Curated annotation (Swiss-Prot):
<dbReference type="GO" id="GO:0046872">
    <property type="term" value="F:metal ion binding"/>
</dbReference>
<dbReference type="InterPro" id="IPR046452">
    <property type="entry name" value="HgmA_N"/>
</dbReference>
<feature type="binding site">
    <location>
        <position position="324"/>
    </location>
    <ligand>
        <name>Fe cation</name>
    </ligand>
</feature>
<keyword id="KW-0479">Metal-binding</keyword>
<dbReference type="Pfam" id="PF20510">
    <property type="entry name" value="HgmA_N"/>
</dbReference>
<dbReference type="InterPro" id="IPR005708">
    <property type="entry name" value="Homogentis_dOase"/>
</dbReference>
<dbReference type="GO" id="GO:0006570">
    <property type="term" value="P:tyrosine metabolic process"/>
</dbReference>
<keyword id="KW-0560">Oxidoreductase</keyword>
<dbReference type="InterPro" id="IPR011051">
    <property type="entry name" value="RmlC_Cupin_sf"/>
</dbReference>
<comment type="similarity">
    <text>Belongs to the homogentisate dioxygenase family.</text>
</comment>
<keyword id="KW-0223">Dioxygenase</keyword>
<feature type="binding site">
    <location>
        <position position="288"/>
    </location>
    <ligand>
        <name>Fe cation</name>
    </ligand>
</feature>
<dbReference type="GO" id="GO:0004411">
    <property type="term" value="F:homogentisate 1,2-dioxygenase activity"/>
</dbReference>
<keyword id="KW-0408">Iron</keyword>
<feature type="binding site">
    <location>
        <position position="294"/>
    </location>
    <ligand>
        <name>Fe cation</name>
    </ligand>
</feature>
<dbReference type="InterPro" id="IPR014710">
    <property type="entry name" value="RmlC-like_jellyroll"/>
</dbReference>
<dbReference type="GO" id="GO:0006559">
    <property type="term" value="P:L-phenylalanine catabolic process"/>
</dbReference>
């Protein structure tokens, strides 16, 4: 049994409400919290930006990777591309595909979540056929047979929930239809296009189990179902179907934007929304120590209002153990309420256990990112 030691207390000069109405002499609020944004927290009011460091030594640091330039990601099989970020519960890769997959893929290690960063394709799987295109999540249950035939070249973010299954978040007070109605989730169809690919031709299935590949050969195409019933399926969700929670008086924590819940991590989606309009409300992400989680952000589209020099296809990685938050120009723009609407789209992965990054990721790292919070850095 675990019960936090909690006793709300005020000390010195502080605001009555988190993320709003800061003391004039200390406009930099820092949240130190436990269990993501669900545990006990303290809010400090600082005279200087908590990210105002002048030097940084050691391996623990904020990192940025340009996943547009990762080597070895152009492959005909998702199991041929390198791991980029990983722990025992989640595996993150990117994959570029321009030709039809010659074999079926099957992930026996866990559910696979594909986010289509670029392109369009026909997805064929045990459940039927559907088209996936830019902005789609395709959630593929563990051990499903599937393949892609690109209509346009694909750039895919892959997020494996190792030895576990994805679920939807509990929505609590706002109800089951908030953020997105489950009715917007699409499933594959046993349609004419699916039936047209029935064949007696030899077909291989590449199965990944314990990170190792086995190949099963059939004298026919195993995607030969004429129908199915049940409540397990591949599902598709586009970020444009997400209607974000918002408040004009309070900057909601990232957890309000949770899209899928994995074992040991969550996947959140940041989509365009109005910026807080109340004069006292914080209008950019707050400085925070998310001390129990590592944070990964994949930037998909738009103007990333809290970050400088970040483009689509890049990733920032903020491990637990230090404060992170908006860059100086973004913080100042928030104070001046320059923007009334965000137009960014990004995928966030918050992991309960520490992530490792691979050599393939390190090769595309911007080692100067740690100093991007310095006002002089362009």
């Amino acid at each position: 049994m675990h019960k936090w030691i909690t006793f709300p207390h005020r000390e010195g000069t502080c605001s009555r409400q988190a993320h709003a109405d800061f003391p004039e002499q200390a406009i930099y609020e820092r949240e130190a919290g436990r269990s993501g944004f669900f545990g006990p927290a303290a809010h400090f009011h600082h005279q200087h930006a908590p990210t105002g460091w002048s030097e940084w030594e050691g391996e623990l640091r904020p990192r940025a990777f340009n996943f547009n330039h990762v080597e070895g990601v152009n492959a005909l099989s998702p199991w041929q591309v390198p791991l980029l970020l990983h722990n025992h519960e989640v595996k993150v890769r990117v994959w570029k595909l321009e030709q039809a997959m010659p074999a079926l893929a099957r992930n026996a290690d866990g559910d696979e979540l594909l986010f289509i960063h670029q392109g369009k394709a026909d997805l064929y799987c045990d459940y039927g056929h559907m088209v996936v295109s830019e902005g789609d999540y395709a959630l593929i249950p563990r051990s499903t047979n599937w393949r892609l035939e690109p209509i346009e070249p694909l750039f895919i973010l892959m997020i494996e929930n190792t030895d576990a299954a994805y679920a939807l978040p509990e929505k609590g007070l706002v109800g089951n239809h908030a953020v997105f109605d489950p009715a917007v989730l699409d499933v594959p169809s046993i349609n004419d296009q699916f039936r047209a690919q029935y064949s007696e031709q030899q077909t291989q299935v590449q199965v990944k189990r314990h990170g190792q590949l086995s190949t099963i050969t059939f004298p026919f195409n195993p995607l030969d179902a004429v129908g199915w019933h049940g409540d397990l399926s591949v599902v598709r969700l586009n970020w444009r179907d997400i209607r974000p929670l918002m408040s004009h008086r309070y900057h909601l924590p990232p957890s309000a934007h949770t899209t899928f819940v994995g074992q040991g991590f969550v996947v959140c989606t940041f989509v365009p929304r109005p910026i807080e309009s109340d004069p006292g409300a914080l209008k950019v992400p707050f400085y925070h120590n998310n001390d129990d989680y590592d944070e990964v952000l994949f930037y998909h589209a738009g103007d990333f209002f809290s970050r400088d020099n970040i483009e689509a296809g890049m990733v920032t990685f903020h491990p637990a153990g230090f404060t992170h938050g908006p860059h100086p120009k973004a913080f100042q723009a928030g104070l001046e309420y320059r923007k009334k609407f965000t137009d960014e789209v990004a995928v966030m992965i918050d992991t309960r256990h520490a992530l490792q990054f691979s050599d393939a990721a390190q090769q595309v790292e911007n080692r100067q990112y740690v100093y991007s919070w310095q006002s002089k850095v362009e």
